[in-house]
Amino acid sequence: MYDVAVIGGGPGGCRAAGLAARRGLKTVLFEREELGGVCLNYGCIPIKLLLHAARMYEALELEAPQFGIDAEGFRWDFETLWKRKERTVARLRAALRQRLQAAAVELVNSEAAVESKLPGGFCIEAGGCRYEARQPIWAAGGKPHIPAIPGIAEALAAGFAVTPRELPAAVPPSLLILGGGAAGIELATFFRIAGSAVTIVEAGNTLGGRLDFRLAQFLTAALEKRGVKIHTANTIPRIGDGWAELADGSRLTASKLLITCGWEAAAAVPASPGVQVIGDAAGRRFLAPVAEWEAEAAVDRLCGISPERTQPVVARAIFAIPEVATAGMTLDEARQMDAAAYERRLPLTLSGRYMAEHPLENGFGVGVYSGAGELLGVHLAGSGAAELAGSFQINGRAVMPPHPSLSEFNRLLQAGES
């Protein structure tokens, strides 16, 4: 019998399996597709690589002359870029597999289900075989939310509509993006710089979800300056072959429709009591750092360690160009608990390095404080915002940096992990 069976090999599942095995627990990890989950294979990492390419292209186009660089004649080579993306993902996947195997985690490439409760454990079925484990950890991850819009199923089947998982390997002449959250904004940024005519349709009043309104304005201005068309407070009630209808009856045509309407749990949680559920599968906060924190808490409980664990303050970022990042409360949220709460706004140009490296930007940071002066929230806009966000203490707690960021390395080094 295994001590721990982890179902799902995304950030939370891999974190739980590796930590359990390093603590001496006999551990098996089930993953039906590729290790790393959506984040590594289709989401966070490959999208950041595409954005890095877009950032370099735009820097050559707009900033190079200001630094005395004559950069005429550069062009996109999308075949090379896509190969680079696939190689990078494969390399990271292989490194993840090696780390898990080095920790003595048994890997099973199969879908798995918790079948029944046994005396002292659980029965798990995977690939026609049965496994017994003292404690399962359900980390089956999430999947893109597909809204119930007439015509969307047919559009997906025909290849007109895609999710970030099926990004076209060629840049489409025109792209309609349904959803103005992080993925929608990031991919709108890349495809517009790559040459697509891009339109975003967002049901909310602003882009970016629950962002400070100034960050939403910052993102909107950057996109519109590049020529991205944005329809907020709008919906698409019907989709056809090469078109989508807005709520007012007007039609938008496009070569591709990209669906970025949020996230949901990929599978139903097992009914058996006693199964620990972590990460996106729990349907609480769809963030990789949250999944990893919940994985650590789950393994602590298995090992009989019950430290005082409060929900972490997790920074989240939208890696547009320039990027924005946020952690903690907005001023409105702070004033619900402290009427004397206040805020301060400072320009990022107070940093000499920022001013030297980003002459075309006008970034800023906003701090939200309690009446007693304690920092309750930070909201940052400009290059480097994601790395800055993980450097604060909010309400007496260290902020977990956004994913993916270099700041995450601090935690690994402090924990002595390989």
Where are these regions (language model features)?
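Glycine-rich active-site loop/strand segments that organize a redox cofactor
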Residues: I47-R84, E308-R309
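Short glycine/serine/threonine-rich phosphate/pyrophosphate-binding segments
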Residues: G12-A16, G184-L187, A266
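FAD-binding core/adjacent interface of flavoenzyme oxidoreductases
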Residues: M1-I7, L19-K26, L35-I45, H52, ...
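Flexible, glycine-rich terminal cap/loop adjacent to redox cofactors
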Residues: I7-G12, A16-G18, R22-E33, I45, ...
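Rossmann-like dinucleotide-binding cores of NAD(P)H-dependent redox enzymes
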Residues: R87-R93, A169-L176, A182-R238, L287-A288, ...
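Conserved N-terminal glycine-rich FAD pyrophosphate-binding loop of Rossmann-like flavoproteins
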Residues: E33-R55, T206-L219
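Generic enzyme active-site microenvironment
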Residues: L29, I200, I278
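Contiguous mid-protein beta-loop-alpha structural module that forms a pocket-lining wall or clamp
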Residues: I259-L302
